[in-house]
Amino acid sequence: MKTKEDMQELYFPTPKLIEWENGVRQYSTVRGDTEVLMSYVPPHTNVEPHQHKEVQIGMVVSGELMMTVGDVTRKMTALESAYIAPPHVPHGARNDTDQEVIAIDIKRLKADETYTSPEDYFLDIFKTRDLLPGMEVTFFVEDWVEIMLAKIPGNGGEMPFHKHRNEQIGICIGGGYDMTVEGCTVEMKFGTAYFCEPREDHGAINRSEKESKSINIFFPPRYNRAKAKKMKADE
């Protein structure tokens, strides 16, 4: 029988610190086929091009980064775009600024998934709307994945408990809120990640006075399925 600690480690894995010779620090959390990396890139630091069998998607949370995927280089500013590096496609980054950059990268390899990307490997904002009254969300969409930036209002703003057929991962990137997965509740703070498999019950509430922010990833897309289906049909 699983203990409360076992359940918490399943849904909210303890981050493991990875330190690289160039000074980059990464906090890694893993469930199943997916790894979330919260990366801290020092000023004037290069991350040399590399490749691997997993697909990798990423977004800048703070600062700006020159990101290269394949032969395409683009300046990424905080929460304005995302990249997709398909399996075995080289990718690297460069922080040309005087400030530390914080970025989130997600690596995944699942046997039944096909990892497409735009021709230039970068996703721009698809749309911004209110998901619930007072809860603004912004979407980035590819046919197999959907990224949703969410703002949860303070003083009791909540995402009611629900479940769905999609796998869902979330990372707190501002403020804090209580996140519950299958009855296991954790106080989310900057960098905390949760993993929710299909049909696992989950919900969130922000009990603080300040708005909280999170990045949520759905496999496959949940809220923009029509766009994802059209993208697949156009391939």
Swiss-Prot record:
Positions with a binding annotation for substrate: 223
Domain of life: Bacteria
Signal peptide: none
This enzyme's EC code(s): 5.3.3.19
Keywords attached to this entry: Antibiotic biosynthesis, Cobalt, Cytoplasm, Iron, Isomerase, Metal-binding
Listed GO CC annotations: cytoplasm
Catalytic activity line of the entry: 3-[(4R)-4-hydroxycyclohexa-1,5-dien-1-yl]-2-oxopropanoate = 3-[(1E,4R)-4-hydroxycyclohex-2-en-1-ylidene]pyruvate
Amino-acid positions noted as binding a divalent metal cation 1 in the UniProt annotation, renumbered to this chain: 50, 52, 56, 91
Metabolic or biological pathway, per its Swiss-Prot or TrEMBL entry: Antibiotic biosynthesis; bacilysin biosynthesis
Localisation per UniProt entry: Cytoplasm
GO MF terms held by the record: cobalt ion binding; intramolecular oxidoreductase activity, transposing C=C bonds; iron ion binding
Upregulation: The compound guanosine 5'-diphosphate 3'-diphosphate (ppGpp) is essential for the transcription of the bacABCDEF operon and BacG, and GTP regulates the transcription of both this operon and ywfH via the CodY-mediated regulation system.
Disulfide bond entries: none
Function (record text): Part of the bacABCDEF operon responsible for the biosynthesis of the nonribosomally synthesized dipeptide antibiotic bacilysin, composed of L-alanine and L-anticapsin. Bacilysin is an irreversible inactivator of the glutaminase domain of glucosamine synthetase. BacB catalyzes the allylic isomerization of the endocyclic-delta(4),delta(8)-7R-dihydro-hydroxyphenylpyruvate (en-H2HPP) to generate a mixture of 3E,7R- and 3Z, 7R-olefins (E/Z ration of 3/1) of the exocyclic-delta(3),delta(5)-dihydro-hydroxyphenylpyruvate (ex-H2HPP).
Assembly description: Monomer.
Protein name: H2HPP isomerase
